[in-house]
A protein has these predicted regions:
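Catalytic domains of carbohydrate-active enzymes, especially glycoside hydrolases
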Residues: 1-9, 152-157
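Generic enzyme active-site microenvironment
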Residues: 4, 18, 72, 203
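Short alpha-helical
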Residues: 10-11, 80, 108, 165, ...
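Metal-dependent phosphodiesterase/phospholipase catalytic core, i.e.
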Residues: 19-129, 151-155, 160-163
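Phosphate- and divalent-cation-binding pockets in alpha/beta enzyme and binding domains
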Residues: 12, 112-113, 168, 194
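Glycine-rich, proline-tolerant flexible connector loops at the mouths of alpha/beta enzymes
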Residues: 9-22
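Paired acidic/hydrophobic, glycine-rich loop segments that form the ligand-binding mouth/hinge
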Residues: 3, 121-123, 201-203
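C-terminal active-site rim and adjoining tail of enzyme catalytic domains
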Residues: 132-213
Length: 213
C-alpha cells in the first residue's frame, strides 16, 4: 500500500512527519509544534511508538522510504500565509526518486506547489463545510467547500471527507473532468463499502481494505 502522512515545520523551518499542530496528543511535549526548534522536536518521544523515537525529519523519512511505495504528503497549514513549510517540502522532494504527490486543505499551499513542483501530482483536501475553521472568513470557507479556487490551484485530484459523500463537488469533478477522488479517513470495511461508488482511492487505518472489504 501507499503511505499517507502529514508534515509540519519547526520554528527554524525544518519539515517533520507529524499530524497535529500541537504536541500533547502524540508526544510527551506541550504547546504548538511550530514553537519548537528542530533539535528540540527530534528529542521528543512519540507516544505509543514501538521504539523510543521522536518525530522523524521529512528528509530522513524520504531516505528511509527510498521510493519503495507511493507516498502521499499532506502539507499542514495554519492559513496564515506562511510559505516556509511548502517551500521546504518541495525542496526536499525535488530529487526524490519515487512516486509522490502533495495535497493540502489550503488552496494557497496547493497553488504554491503548482509553481514550485509542477511535475508532482497535487490535490486539494476538502469537505462539505468549514464551520470548524473560525480563523477563515465566510468567503474563504465557501470557496474551499465549493472548490472555487480551481483556476489558481489546478489540482490533479480531490481528497474529500468520507462523511460528506456523496457530494456534488467531488462528483462533478470525477464525472465531468475525470478527476480522481480520494476519501479520508476510512476506519472500517463497512465505511469503505458505502463510499466505494463515489471514490477511486481511500486513506485508511485500522483495517486491511485488500482483505476486509
Amino acid at each position: 500500500y501507499a503511505i499517507e502522512c502529514d508534515v509540519q515545520d519547526s520554528v527554524d523551518g525544518e519539515a517533520f512527519v507529524f499530524h497535529d499542530h500541537t504536541l500533547e496528543r502524540l508526544t510527551g511535549g506541550e504547546g504548538p509544534f511550530k514553537a519548537r526548534k528542530a533539535q528540540e522536536i527530534a528529542g521528543l518521544s512519540l507516544r505509543h511508538a514501538a521504539l523510543s523515537e521522536g518525530p522523524p525529519r521529512l528528509s530522513d523519512f524520504l531516505a528511509l522510504l527510498a521510493g519503495q511505495v507511493p507516498l502521499v504528503l499532506e502539507i499542514k497549514s495554519r492559513f496564515d500565509g506562511d510559505e516556509t513549510l511548502t517551500r521546504r517540502t518541495c525542496a526536499l522532494i525535488a530529487d526524490y526518486d519515487g512516486p509522490i504527490c502533495l495535497k493540502s486543505f489550503d488552496p494557497a499551499v496547493v497553488a504554491l506547489v503548482r509553481d514550485l513542483a509542477p511535475e508532482r501530482p497535487r490535490g486539494i483536501v476538502a469537505q462539505a463545510d468549514f464551520d470548524d475553521a473560525p480563523q477563515l472568513g465566510e468567503t474563504e470557507r465557501r470557496a474551499m467547500a465549493h472548490l472555487l479556487h480551481f483556476s489558481q490551484t489546478q489540482p490533479d485530484f480531490i481528497s474529500w471527507n468520507h462523511r460528506d459523500l456523496p457530494h456534488a463537488a467531488p462528483f462533478l469533478c470525477r464525472s465531468l473532468r475525470s478527476m480522481p477522488v480520494m476519501a479520508w479517513t476510512i476506519r472500517d470495511a463497512a465505511a469503505a463499502r458505502v463510499i466505494a461508488p463515489w471514490v477511486d482511492q481511500i486513506v485508511f487505518e485500522g483495517f486491511d481494505p485488500g482483505s476486509d472489504v
